[in-house]
């Protein structure tokens, strides 16, 4: 997900996306531990998406203060 797309979301939608990505990351880590994960690049993509969302949320929080 690109930063431009994330910025278009509301704060609640961003928090929901972050929650979804965290759940996906948990599942991917579990698959990796059991040797079932085929696309290991997905781990880094999901982590980066979480970081993007957190960064934009903190930017919005600073704007509002």
From Swiss-Prot:
Gene Ontology BP annotations: translation
PROSITE patterns per record: RIBOSOMAL_L29
Keyword Translocase appears in the UniProt entry: no
Entry keywords, A to Z: Ribonucleoprotein, Ribosomal protein
Pfam families on file: Ribosomal_L29 (PF00831)
PANTHER family: 60S RIBOSOMAL PROTEIN L35/50S RIBOSOMAL PROTEIN L29 (PTHR10916), LARGE RIBOSOMAL SUBUNIT PROTEIN UL29C (PTHR10916:SF0)
Similarity annotation: Belongs to the universal ribosomal protein uL29 family.
HAMAP family linked to this entry: Ribosomal_uL29 (MF_00374)
Name of the protein: Large ribosomal subunit protein uL29
Lineage: Bacteria, Bacillati, Bacillota, Bacilli, Lactobacillales
């Amino acid at each position: 997900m690109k930063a431009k797309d994330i910025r278009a979301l509301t704060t609640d939608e961003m928090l929901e996306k972050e929650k979804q990505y965290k759940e996906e990351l948990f599942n991917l880590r579990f698959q990796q531990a059991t040797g079932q994960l085929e696309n290991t690049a997905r781990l880094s993509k999901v982590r980066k998406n979480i970081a993007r969302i957190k960064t934009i949320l903190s930017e919005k929080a600073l704007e509002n203060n």
